[in-house]
Amino acid sequence: MPLFVRFLQTLNPTKQNARLRSPWPFSLLTQTASISSLKVAWRKDRLLDSAIERDKRCRVCARVVREVLNEPGHAIPLRYLEKRRERLGLPVKVKTFLSRYPNLFDLYPDRIKPKTEPVPFLRPSPRLRSFLALEASLRARHEPLVLAKLCKLLMMSRDKVIPAEKLLNVKRDFGFPNDLLTSLVPKYPHLLRLVGSPGEGKSFLELVSWNEEYAKSVIEQRADEEARLTGIRMRPNFTVRLPPGFYLKREMREWVRDWLELPYVSPYADASGLHPASPEMEKRMVGMLHEVLSLSLLKRVAVPVLGKFCEEYRFSNAFANTFTRHSGIFYVSLKGGIKTAMLREAYDQGELVDRDPLLEIRDKFVLMMEEGYNEYMQRLRTKREAMQKDLELMAKSNSELSEDESSERL
């Protein structure tokens, strides 16, 4: 039984069979409540919040590495990096950071100017350089996936054109390479074209030709796969997972039930004939947001980042309310002081289960971090053990000295 049908049964099991017979329920035609008037209270999900919190160390380390790699010669004076701590979000001094992750950088003396005294510089360590070489190899292997993501983002846009600057701003969300416009785009002139002057910030990436292989959403692919496995034609629809203890008011339950019964509207389909305030347009927008999040590395994107694409994807000004209105599909985390939209179905007990192949690069980086941190912890343990032995020896020596003094007095 499709998951959305099981969800309908939980909403109203007595009416479910009757409502499924008609894809255009009468209640939708007579419903007076507008979409925007239906409110759902936000509810904290600690497990999903913890997924964001766990990535904090990785994000900080990656920012520091990028900062050094962006410097000429991939080297920077230690004190210069210290001055950028606040901007990098580094909560400890740079020296403390380097001691915790000793395998990321090498410290060496050099002069900032020819006739000045040498000062500490840092540069990528052999271990970090080895990772960078591996990253380049993995990116080459996964280039078809990156190309597909880029084409899909363009195919969903209104005019099949997106400002290059906006795509560069989300490169880390979707796993795009830093040199996206100069390395990837020129390789595929039959699919992509850069228009304008990149240096002036007035360039646009344009879709040259439509590829039907890319014009199928994750939800449609999932329905096709279920049909292949079961031999029964499956209707594409959203996976709905209401969090434990979450309660919807009656009018909202009825609206969600009827809304789920509407035909799925692909984000790649022409929606020019849909009324902006219609439930069908709402379903298309949810499908669009679902697809964009599905294309992201971690199945989550900051809401302000998504808001920058309102014009390209025809999001309404109140698009962010969609996430809370469909709390069984999305979750909005407030961790880190920023709203982050997450796909519920991609996580299980706070762990990401729908893993993007490009996460292999991130996993290798985390492994390198853990190796360095374990080395740091081992040094601390060795130091503590040595101090403990010294204290024991001192105590033993003092005890023997006291015994000798007592013997002399006798």
Predicted regions and their residues:
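Long amphipathic alpha-helical repeat/alpha-solenoid cores
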Residues: 2-410
